[in-house]
Amino acid sequence: MRALKPLIATAVLSALTVFSTGAVADPTLADAIRAGDRATALKMIQGGADVNAAQADGTTPLQWATYRNDPELMKALLARGAKAKVTNSFGASPLSEAVKIANLDLVMQLLKAGADVESPNADGQTVLMLAAHNGSVEIARALLKYGANVNAVETWRGQTALMWAAAEKHPEVVELLVAQHAKVDVAASANDWGEQITSEPRAQYRPTGGLTALMYAARSGCIECARALLKGHADINMPSPDGVTPLLTALDNLHYDLAKMLIEQGANPNTWDWWGRTPLYVAVDMHSYPSSRIAYNGPKVNVVVTDKTRCSDMIRLILASGVNPNPQLNMHRPGRGGNSQRFVENLLTTGATPLLRAAVAQDAEAVEILLERQALVDLPNVMGVTPLIAASGMGISINDPRPLFEGDMQGRALATLELLVKAGADVNARVLDTTSHNAKIARPSSMTDRQGQTALYGPVIWGWTRVARFLLDHGARTDIVDATGKGPLDLILKGDVANRDHKTDDEMVSLIRTAAVVTH
């Protein structure tokens, strides 16, 4: 059976060759225009050359004239009977090319000559979508005048022209489409990922999709696009399949002016997404996320926020609306960069609060704002890690983001700890659970065997003597041992069970031993 396949293939190719030889006209005119030989092309047209003779891939002289952005050549071709309603084997048409290069003159010539006003490609992408993507409002207006379907949906991602305009920050096009009755609340296709597990196995976050035009505007930061959509009665709180609202989207993308506008227009600040992230949590998360850092397995990220509204303003605004200051995550939030951020910000898992999130980053400003609004100072995550334990350095791993922050990390930690202690944080609170089934589901590897440890273990792990001294001065006990029977000093001298924390430091050893003598 295998031996017959080459013979069959040869026969098919021979048949195609015979067919092609008889069907394809002389493409010399198309070749000349493609080569940019305008003078020769005009002479050929005047001499009666076949103006519809296509190249092997179906591209006609008219398509190449459009590509060359040549209105005069197009006019000559159309006058000789060139077909405007034609596509090549790639699904490209003269009209799609004219819209792509944003030449209104070419577009009008083609429409008047009978071009298909939709001219979709193989994925159903219409020329109105191209105009929306480019921000070509006059071309979009012309297409609509000739009957373009304002609500056409392409088949690849289920997106509309309105979504493209909002995503590319073209408010004038958004206004035009809304005025022409574009559906403002239709959502793009969503991926119902049955499993997000690799062969390792490990969960890997994959975006679900299902965004509306307002969500695209929120993601791109186009505040005027959002205003136009809201004026067209877009649902300000309509979430994605993951529960992410336009407000969450704006905050998550550092668009604080837009987020503020959404709240002023009635966006609900009491929503939460699949992971349990509320607008307050995301605002604190973005405030605590440094503008420049090394991403896990990724490049350095440099973010410049130009909005007049600061992230701290958004935290205060959301809190002023009366939201719960202590929402807790359902699970580890999706990672920036498309993965679960294994080994990065390990404590931001089930039960994490905005205060814990701020404490992980030693973000004293956010901590102070939250405490002023009665955030619970000792509310822990599922493992029992409190904000004070987190601020002291607990949850270390080789890829932890904290050593990548700029500036004096011990100074940041101390500023945060002072606020937490002043608010009544328990300096001897212990990690409660890293071994139960529930804890293991949420537990990162860096927290293995840390059950029973206190905040004092954190600076010992890092070698932060100033932080250790602060905790000792505020009542931290040296005689508490973890579930493996090791105290803070044991970690310095012997390391832990996994040998992660073996950091011999003479100054720290002396500090802990002296404190142990004093307390006994």
Predicted regions and their residues:
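Bacterial N-terminal signal peptides
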Residues: 9-18
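N-terminal segments that cap or nucleate solenoid repeat domains
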Residues: 24-64
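Ankyrin repeat A-helix N-terminal signature
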Residues: 31-35, 64-70, 97-103, 130-136, ...
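Conserved ankyrin/ankyrin-like repeat signature
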Residues: 40, 72-73, 105-106, 138-139, ...
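Ankyrin repeat domain, specifically the short helix-to-loop turn at the C-terminus of the second helix
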Residues: 45-50, 75-83, 108-116, 141-149, ...
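Ankyrin repeat boundary/linker residues
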Residues: 55, 88, 121, 154-155, ...
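Start-of-repeat signature of ankyrin repeats
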Residues: 58, 91, 124, 157-158, ...
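Leucine-rich solenoid repeat scaffolds
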Residues: 478-516
